[in-house]
Amino acid sequence: MGTSYRKLGYVLFLMLGMIVEEGIAYVRVKEKQSSPSFMGIYDESAVASDAVPCAEAGQSMLRQKGSAVDAAIATLLCIGVYNPQSSGIGGGSFMVIYDRSTRTPEVIDAREEAPAAATQKMFKGDKKLSSEGGLSIAVPGELRGMALAHERHGKLDWETLFQPAIRLAKEGFPVGSELAMALREQRSHILNSPTLKAVFTDPVSGDILKENDIVIRTKLGETLEKIAKNGADEFYEGQVAKDLINDIKSFGGIITAEDLKNYQPVLKNATVAHLSGCLTLYSVPPPSSGYILSFILRVLDKFHFSKASVSDIENATLTYHRFLETLKYAYAYRTKLGDERIENVSSVIAELTSEDVIEKTKQKIEDGKTYEPLHYGAQLATNDHGTAHISVVSREGDAVVVTTTINYWFGSGLRSPSTGVILNDEMDDFSAPDIQNIYGVPPSKANFIVPGKRPQSSTCPSIFVNKGGDVVMAIGASGGTRITSSVSLTSMRVLWLGRNIKEAIDEPRLHHQLLPDEIEYESKFPNEILEKLKAIGHKTKPAGAFGSLVVGIKRMKGGTLTANYDYRRGGSVDGSK
C-alpha cells in the first residue's frame, strides 16, 4: 500500500525517484520524527517535493519510462508555474548529471548572462537599479539548458515534458503557504507593479491573493504550449522571443533579439574532490561555488571528525569553531572567482584544489582564536537570493541535481504581459566598481559586469559517489550566500558526525560568510555553544526568517535510499518499496 506525506511550501529542493509499481509509489516512513518533516525510507528510489503538483509531474514522466533528466525537466517547468516567486523560465540554472553506466559526471551551465549593451557602471552607483526594473534583467538561460540536457539524456518527447506545467498554468491552482508569504512580504511591490498585480491580486477586493486562493496563469500556459510544440528556440528566436523583447524594452531593459538568439548553455566538466572513505564529490565549476564547497569539505576532512566531535559542549564548540574558521577562508576565495570563460581564475582554482593549500589552511586554524576579516583575505562578497533545487536518483543509479533561480522574490518584479514570463534580476549578482561595502573594501574585479558574462553564484548542487560508482548522496540548498555553508554543514553531519539525512537537515545551523564578520545562528542552536564561541571572539546575531533550506537523498550501506525535505518550509516524500 502506498503512503504519501505532503505539504505545500516554498520550492527549494526536490528529490525525484525512478521506481513505481503499477503507477503507485510505496514508502516506509520513520516514526517518532523530531520535526514536522518525514524521512522516507525506500528500497530503490524516492520522490520528495514541497510542491505536490510538481512531484506528480516528475512521477508522470517516470511512469512513462522517462529518464531522470526527463523527470527533472518536467518538475522544473512545474515549479516555475507553481512557485513564481523563486523560479521559472525567465531565469537560469546549473545542472550536474551523473551517468552510472559510464561513471561520468557532466555539468550544464545555463546561468543567465549580461546583455551585449551592459557596462560596469550602468547602475551609476544606484543599487536599486540592479535589483528592480528593466536594467536588472539578464539574458535567461533556463530553457536552453533544459534543451541541451534533453538532447543528451532525454527519452520522452520534448512536448510530453511540458504537459503537467501547461495544465497547472491554464487550469489554475491554490496559492501555497510559501507563495502566500512571499506575496505578503512583497505586497506593496505587487500592488505597485501592474504586470504582477494582474495575476496575483483578487479582482474583486483588489488586494493580494491569499493562501488557498486560486491563481491562473493563462498567458504563461499559452507560452509553454508554443515552446512545447516548437522547441526551446521558440523562446530565443521565435514569436515568443519577439514578444518578450518588446516587453523588456518597454520596461527600460537593454536585452536585444541578438542577445536572446546568441545565448547558449555551456557543457562543462564537473568539479572533482576526493574525500576520506573513498568518496568522490562532483559539483559545479565557476561561476558557481562547487570549488568552494569542495575546499570546505577537504579542510574539514583533515580534522577526522566523528560522533565524539559533538558528544558534549566542549567538543561541539571546538568542532563548530573549526567549521566557522574554515568557512571564513573559503568565502574569502569565493570573492575572487568569476565566469571562467571571461576571467582568468585558474590560479584561484589551483589554490582551492591544492593539497598543500588545504593542509596549510587546516594548520592556520587555531582552536582558541579568531581574527578580523582581512586576516582571511577578505574582499567584497556579493549576495545572491532565492533559488529552487531538484535532485534525481534513478533506478539505474543515474543522478541529476539542479539549482534554478530568478534571483530575488519575483525576480526583477516584472512580468512580461505578452508571454506571462516573470523576468529575473540576475544583474544584481554582479559586483559594481562604484559600490563599496561598509568595510571600505573594494568589490571583486573578477565579478564585474562584462557583456556576455555570467555572475557569481553560491549554488553548489552536488553528488557524492563511492568507489564502486554508486551515488551515496545527492544534495543541494537554497538561500543565497547561505547555500554553501548549509550544504557543507549538512554533508559534514551525514558523512562524519553520524547523523542520518533527516537529523542532519533538522539540526539548527550556523553560517559565516566572512563579511559581515558575524555568525548567523538559528534560534534553536544551543546557547551554551554560542556563549563559548563568543568567548573565543566570534560575534553573533540571530538568523532572519528566510535562511537556507536543504533537501537530500542518502543511500545507506545496504543500498536503501533515505530522503528528507527541510521542515523549515515543508514538503513531501514518496517512493517505491
From Swiss-Prot:
This is Scoloptoxin SSD14. Expressed by the venom gland. GO terms for biological process: glutathione catabolic process; killing of cells of another organism. The keyword Cytoplasm does not apply. Residues 1-25 form the signal peptide. It comes from the Eukaryota. GO terms for molecular function: glutathione hydrolase activity; toxin activity. GO terms for cellular component: extracellular region; plasma membrane. Heterodimer composed of subunits alpha and beta; probably disulfide-linked. Its main location: secreted. The keyword Calcium does not apply. It is found in: Secreted. Keywords: Cytolysis, Disulfide bond, Hemolysis, Hemostasis impairing toxin, Platelet aggregation activating toxin, Secreted, Signal, Toxin. Dose-dependently induces human platelet aggregation on both plasma rich platelet and washed platelet (max. response at 3.2 ug/mL) and causes hemolysis against mouse and rabbit erythrocytes (35 and 65% respectively at 5 ug/mL). Does not show hemolytic activity against human erythrocytes (even at 100 ug/mL).
